[in-house]
């Protein structure tokens, strides 16, 4: 199936549109939230309000689409209070992905025209070798150390809260959407299990969150990714019997899934059942890994 991602404004989405987007393969929508401070959003010409932000994020996640937020810091008037306002809004909307940028000044914006008026700079500045103009470098009320500290606070707080956000996902109660919801949850689980969130030091015990999401996915509908991820997790913990149960159920639902079959074969090997493992591996021997484990099984069977 084709999957795709989108960028949208919080004041342009509705439940019906999001439902059709999800059915068409949309798995993520990014929204420019920018700040929890209404004053800063006004300065940035963001014609959105808090209620629109809350509604868009709730509807997007409810449809089984990952809602990602873009935040900007180092804006005019940025302070500890405005950063706290952003953290408060973040806690309300609970984005499952977030990117934090330092505010840059670009041509064609009101900030750029204001910058030229304040400094006497002309468009010739772009004849220099430069990628951007960070706003804080032009505002004596801000300094680099302060702005960088704001960024660290936003990122660290977000990632420390993220497991709670993932565990409290509220999905639409639509039986027809259950397979799509299961896909959404298992996809997010994989990010905690083996993806970016698994490697982020500010996220505590990402594997525990991954397990919650895998199991919740399987409570909704059979999902190959969830069966495999949960089975691998249990296998890694040496809970062989539980991994066999999960993977065998997965293979029953997805009999042609080579990854589940290979993982189940390894669990049978760990349990000492080399004949059962070999029966699973023989159809997969085009895969070098399957050939390797099949060889081990044959050797073990000869020795017995």
Label for each model-derived stretch:
Residues 5-183, 198-208, 215:
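A structural motif corresponding to the C-terminal lobe/cap of the Radical SAM core domain
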């Amino acid at each position: 199936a084709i999957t795709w991602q989108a960028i949208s404004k919080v004041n342009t989405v509705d439940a019906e549109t999001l439902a059709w987007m999800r059915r068409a393969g949309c798995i993520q929508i990014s929204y420019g939230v920018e700040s929890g401070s209404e004053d800063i959003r006004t300065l940035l010409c963001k014609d959105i309000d808090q209620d629109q932000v809350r509604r868009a994020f709730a509807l997007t996640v409810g449809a089984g689409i990952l809602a990602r937020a873009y935040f900007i810091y180092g804006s005019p008037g940025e302070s500890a209070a405005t950063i706290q306002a952003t953290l408060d809004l973040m806690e309300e909307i609970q984005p499952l992905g977030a990117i934090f940028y330092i505010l840059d000044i670009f041509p064609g914006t009101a900030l750029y025209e204001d910058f030229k008026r304040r400094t006497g700079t002309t468009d010739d500045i772009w004849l220099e070798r430069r990628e951007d103009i960070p706003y804080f470098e032009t505002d004596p009320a801000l300094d680099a150390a302060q702005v960088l500290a704001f960024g660290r606070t936003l990122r660290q707080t977000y990632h420390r809260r993220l497991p709670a956000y993932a565990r409290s996902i509220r999905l639409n109660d639509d039986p027809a959407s259950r397979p799509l919801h299961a896909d959404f949850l298992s996809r997010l689980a994989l990010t905690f299990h083996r993806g970016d969130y698994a490697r982020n030091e500010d996220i505590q015990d990402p594997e525990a969150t991954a397990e919650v999401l895998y199991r919740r996915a399987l409570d909704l509908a059979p999902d190959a990714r969830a069966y495999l991820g949960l089975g691998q997790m249990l296998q890694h913990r040496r809970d062989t019997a539980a991994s066999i149960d999960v993977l065998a159920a997965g293979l029953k639902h997805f009999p042609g899934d080579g990854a589940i079959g290979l993982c189940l074969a390894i669990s049978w090997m760990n349990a000492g059942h080399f004949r059962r493992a070999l029966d699973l591996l023989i159809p997969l021997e085009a895969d070098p890994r399957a050939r390797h484990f099949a060889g081990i099984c044959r050797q073990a069977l000869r020795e017995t």
